[in-house]
Amino acid sequence: MMDVKLKIQQLVNLIKNYDYHYYVLSEPLIDDFEYDMLYKSLQQLEKDHPDLIQIDSPTQRVGGEAVKGFKKLNHNSPMLSLENAFSTKEIANFIDNINFQTNSKNEFVVEPKIDGVSISLTYKNGVLVHALTRGDGSVGEDVLNNVKTIKSIPLTIPFTKTIEIRGEIFVDKKTFLAINNQLEKPFANARNLAAGTIRNLNSEITAQRKLRALFYYIPNGLEESITTQTMVLEQLKQWKFPVSDTIRVFQNKFQLINYLEAFDKKREQLTFNLDGLVIKLNSLLFYQQLGATSKSPRWAIAFKFSPKFVQTKLTAVLITIGRTGRVNYTAKLESVNLDGTKVTAATLHNFDYIKTKDIRINDTVVIYKAGEIIPKVLKVNLEKRKNDTIIIQEQKYCPSCNSKLVKIVDEVDQYCTNETCKERNIQLINYFVSKTAMDINGLNINTITKLYEHNLVRSIVDLYDLKDKKNQVLKLDLKIGDKLFNKLVDNIENSKQKGMARLLTGLGIKHVGNVLAKNLANHFKNIKALQHASLENLISLNDVGITVAESLYNWFHDPNHLQLIEQLELRQVKTDQLPLKINFETNSIYFQKRFLITGSFNISRDQIKDLLSAKFDCQFASEVKPTVDFVIAGNKPTLRKINHAKELNIPIINEAIWT
């Protein structure tokens, strides 16, 4: 038993060290294959000897079952926010004031102000026992299970007293874009994604979203003879907490201010979003003397970067309808350059936003890039308001079908609920044929609009009857000739085999994006089973809360929708999970094998995966591992993957497998 216990301890220490170098230092020490083998060895030992599982084992980070809510706990010391400074003059005054009050020429530490979610960790006897959100500053929610899924955060530290460690949890730019691309309703910015993820009741979802963290504060540091902020940061590093590598220390006020101004210009190069820099007095000995207001400490201040604001004239408001019937208010603007991009429109969200901000046509408005991506109207420059401004009226009726718009309880958005609405149906058909859904190439929004207006395609069902309307289509000014029409029909026919997940995505059910659609397809296996699911059954599923469950339940209990499904099935559109009822090539050497694809091909990766899945019921890997059966190599494959495959004697094949 001692040999097994020692082996487990060695593996835990080894993997923790590899995790630290990979997730904190960004310096991987071994390749993925070696890491996976070590991890699997540890998993097997723990499976065989569950009584020897250690609390800080890397295997204990994976997400668990969903919880009903988070326990609220008091902070040992208040989690205050920082006072903001918007000019270097304010920073200079802050420094001068502290030097005067302390009668010293002090050092100041400059740290990044990460645009994320504040977190306070508590360790007792060296073990992480609580992870509290800021909450109202006095009371926070304990999101411990979610925080444990963040691999850069130590589950244990070599310190036996009770201690708090504070920092920020965030999502980097690349991860934010990748996750948002999978969501039907994307997050407005990375901070919202981090906040929503860390408070998700299902820690499995949190684990999938690759949250990151940086730490910077030990509230009771003086009790442990830590006397400066630089000592705090050094201690955190020794305990293997992730700490920012962009921290600077200054005694000269002018050098510090020059650094702030220079940093603003290079912040775009960072992999994560900042909304400023924090300037802290380095000496903790003066913290108690300086004290704090009810909201902010007096020994630190946040220098906020100048947002990318420009002013222009709002010339009109465009009101459109989305595929779910949601009403979108968009400001039409006089062309203006914003952060290197020509902007002629910006979102106004909804009418409540317009009313609250008192935004009018012909106003001069301030626009900015929210989350550095989407232009938004921030406010009106009232000093430039003239007598020709026109008050924007709330849209009462759908601009497309003239149906009365409705507001759903607890939502600020308006909706057109008429399922025969022209614009709503055009948007739905356009989404149905998109790559995210049924991936029917050859149809764009303009073509769909003309087909709709000529009564050739009025719903997604009509797409599958288009093959019988060749003469009518060719007569339209669509630049579609005989050859293109035949190719379009082939694409439509091929989409029938896409399976339940893509079909469910394309139906445009509110709150159901492609990721949730795949999960539902894997669970229910076919549309009929989903159709007959109870509300309680839906609520119990991962990724499905009450709001989403009600949306699904209501959609599948609408007679019109049931008829839609029936009509699709009559046209041989597959409503089962993809592998079911497919004539797989079961005698092939490729049947139910695992492939890795590398290099470029004449069709997309998604198309390759769809083709091979339909033929061989296969799976796919992103890295070369012993579990990979075949590597498919195209033009300019990744040499590292090819060499690794050769080392493992994995057969390397080409695109002949699907041609």
From Swiss-Prot:
The protein's required cofactors: Mg(2+); Mn(2+)
InterPro entries xrefs: BRCT_dom, BRCT_dom_sf, DisA/LigA_HHH, DNA_ligase, DNA_ligase_AS, DNA_ligase_CS, DNAligase_adenylation, DNAligase_N
Function as written in the Swiss-Prot or TrEMBL entry: DNA ligase that catalyzes the formation of phosphodiester linkages between 5'-phosphoryl and 3'-hydroxyl groups in double-stranded DNA using NAD as a coenzyme and as the energy source for the reaction. It is essential for DNA replication and repair of damaged DNA.
PROSITE patterns cross-referenced by the UniProt entry: DNA_LIGASE_N1, DNA_LIGASE_N2
Cellular component GO terms, alphabetical: cytosol
Assigned keywords, A-Z: DNA damage, DNA repair, DNA replication, Ligase, Magnesium, Manganese, Metal-binding, NAD, Zinc
Gene: ligA
Reactions accelerated catalytically: NAD(+) + (deoxyribonucleotide)n-3'-hydroxyl + 5'-phospho-(deoxyribonucleotide)m = (deoxyribonucleotide)n+m + AMP + beta-nicotinamide D-nucleotide
Domain BRCT, residue spans: 585-655
Family listed: Belongs to the NAD-dependent DNA ligase family. LigA subfamily.
SUPFAM superfamilies, alphabetized: BRCT domain, DNA ligase/mRNA capping enzyme, catalytic domain, Nucleic acid-binding proteins, RuvA domain 2-like
GO biological process, one term: DNA repair
Protein name (record): DNA ligase
